[in-house]
Amino acid sequence: MSKRHSAKYKLDRRMGENIWGRPKSPVNSRAYGPGQHGQRRKSKVSDFGLQLRAKQKLKGYYGNITEKQFVRIYTEAARRKGNTSENLIALLESRLDAVVYRAKFVPTPFAARQFVNHGHVLVNGKRVNIPSYRVKPGDVVSVRERSRNMALVLEALQSSERDTPDYITLDAKGMSATFVRAPELAEVPYPVKMEPNLVVEFYAS
């Protein structure tokens, strides 16, 4: 098991939730944290602890975005007009790796980042290998023709674990997806409850 793969399941155990809704998550069989002290009785969590947990969960969901990147995204969300929590989610879902994952071209956000990094993705017909690339409404994200028969892609497209959300229009046959618009929090198909409002409180405090 790779370090990133192992870290992913470690996050599931630490949070006590199946963050990505995967059938192999260890919390499907045990709902306690990793390590020898994982089964200790949980104590009351402070407001700061709740805020930190919300940040770790949201950041981890998108493939463990670095703190530096996450702060940059939050700063832009806070600078924009409107609700900072909603802005934060809209920016996260506008990342190229997030769109690739939502389009079901790959099975996980971790795989999406690697897939983009390795040059398998086109945006409006041009190759883009930057996972954090900002996809705009109307942009067409597609899998390069020579990459379309990869087992990773074929298995993900056939998976019934998740559906493509309404803010992405999928052409499964052409292996392309149009990013219709940045979504609101309520539209994003998170398997668990995300609390961006607590993330905002964390950085604002």
UniProtKB/Swiss-Prot annotation:
GO terms for cellular component: small ribosomal subunit. GO terms for molecular function: rRNA binding; structural constituent of ribosome. Gene3D superfamilies: Ribosomal Protein S4 Delta 41, Chain A, domain 1 (1.10.1050.10), RNA-binding S4 domain (3.10.290.10). Keywords: Ribonucleoprotein, Ribosomal protein, RNA-binding, rRNA-binding. Residues 18-46 are annotated as: Disordered. Pfam families: Ribosomal_S4 (PF00163), S4 (PF01479). Residues 94-155 form the S4 RNA-binding domain. GO terms for biological process: ribosomal small subunit biogenesis; translation. Part of the 30S ribosomal subunit. Contacts protein S5. The interaction surface between S4 and S5 is involved in control of translational fidelity. One of the primary rRNA binding proteins, it binds directly to 16S rRNA where it nucleates assembly of the body of the 30S subunit. This is Small ribosomal subunit protein uS4.
